[in-house]
Amino acid sequence: MLLYPSVDDLLAQVDSRYSLIMLASKRAHELDAGSKPLLTDYKSPKTIGRALEEIAAGALMIDPDEKDLDA
């Protein structure tokens, strides 16, 4: 169960659960690949938790003009 950040906090930043999952997943993969963190302090030791913390903090957003090349 997700306690922090709360789903309500996350959905305040991203308009749908699907978009939230896609954004968090892509960011977690970037962090696994060695991308620089966007926050100075994280509560979660896992990359998916860190990605969700970045979204909740407003440090990470979806670019509506970006085309998904993986599709």
Curated annotation (Swiss-Prot):
It catalyses: RNA(n) + a ribonucleoside 5'-triphosphate = RNA(n+1) + diphosphate. HAMAP family: RNApol_bact_RpoZ. The keyword Nucleotidyltransferase applies. It is an enzyme of class 2 (transferase). Belongs to the RNA polymerase subunit omega family. It comes from Levilactobacillus brevis (strain ATCC 367 / BCRC 12310 / CIP 105137 / JCM 1170 / LMG 11437 / NCIMB 947 / NCTC 947). The RNAP catalytic core consists of 2 alpha, 1 beta, 1 beta' and 1 omega subunit. When a sigma factor is associated with the core the holoenzyme is formed, which can initiate transcription. GO terms for biological process: DNA-templated transcription. Gene3D superfamilies: 3.90.940.10. The keyword Ubl conjugation does not apply. The lineage of its organism: Bacteria, Bacillati, Bacillota, Bacilli, Lactobacillales. This is DNA-directed RNA polymerase subunit omega. Its EC number is 2.7.7.6. The gene is rpoZ. InterPro entries: DNA-dir_RNA_pol_omega, Pol_omega/Rpo6/RPB6, RPB6/omega-like_sf. GO terms for molecular function: DNA binding; DNA-directed RNA polymerase activity. Transmembrane segments: none annotated. Keywords: DNA-directed RNA polymerase, Nucleotidyltransferase, Transcription, Transferase. Promotes RNA polymerase assembly. Latches the N- and C-terminal regions of the beta' subunit thereby facilitating its interaction with the beta and alpha subunits. PANTHER family: DNA-DIRECTED RNA POLYMERASE SUBUNIT OMEGA. GO terms for cellular component: DNA-directed RNA polymerase complex.
